[in-house]
Amino acid sequence: MPLPVYRITIKDKDYEQLKSNIWSNHFVPAQLVSGGKRIPIRIRYRGGHTREYPKKSYEIRTSKYTYHFNAEYDDPSLIRNALSFQFFNSIHVPSPSTRHCVLNLNNENLGVYLNIEAVKTPFFRKRGIPVRSIIYAVNDNADFTDKRSSGKSSFSGYNLIKGSERDRVKLSNFVQQIHLKVGAELQQYLRKHLDIENYLRWLCGAVLTGNYDGFNQNYTLFEHGKNRTYRMIPWDYEGTWGRNCYGKLVDSDLVKIQGYNKLTEKILSFRPHRQRYKALLSGFLESVFTVRRQLPIVYKMHNAIADHVYKDPNHKWSDKVFDSEPDTIRKYIDQRRQDILNQLGNLD
């Protein structure tokens, strides 16, 4: 079945403005044609070091929605983000929906892209989740460390997407308080301000998929609108399932079972939370994190995009590497399962 094609047209002067500064976050006007409909949009480049790549990623905004068109340039399979978000959804951690597509800009075929749903207000409305604030972890300062002695703000590393100054102050205070409180007082504080079940499930997802960068950045933190606890949503899971964020093959044990960042450390310092985390991991090893469960999903995604990837003028990997990626992911799952089984005792 052919992938959907999104055709974007940008006026020459606007396109020149876009290309003149790849680091600018300024949007330029454009038109998007999909399914016979022409929609006015705004478009800009997105990403970090990937902006320097020949195949760039884009953020597109309509009057109502925001979409991320990821080039997946460093992932030879082009499916790791999609596979990861589907995995998170299967373990009941709300995650962006995705769809592979072909992007065409001013009649030039840019290749296969992954259209990723933005984690903004419509994301929560669609899922019936009341939300008070939405906060992106945008760099590795978002590691929940005590920053008071460094002179950095406790909000360093974060970007407030929805909310007010009060929400900025609240998160800063949360980061400070987890370092000021100890013992039973800390445990009570965490239970009051953090959805620990959600956090442990998110931790399982990050640890099982092997996303080394997902603990100190590349996540969304949101405050639930009713119970006022913080919850986690994954973001940018290209460096997973046996490869890092640059596409390099890595050992399956790159990410330790205890995960990383100071909040994880604080949570797992309490035995009841370790026991729950261990039970969740054990359950996922028996159910969703298996070759039997994941490989059909891998092959379905891989087969759906294969013909288009072979024609992608900007795919930097050979067809041979692309064709071997399902087996690379299979080997990772087998090895990662053994890693986790060997380390479960560390959670006692």
Question: Where are the model-predicted features located?
Answer:
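Soluble non-cytosolic domains of exported or imported proteins
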Residues: 74-82, 161-169, 194, 268-272, ...
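Middle-to-C-terminal accessory/interaction subdomains
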Residues: 179-210, 224-234, 238-348
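Short, flexible loop/turn elements at secondary-structure junctions
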Residues: 12, 47, 64, 71-73, ...
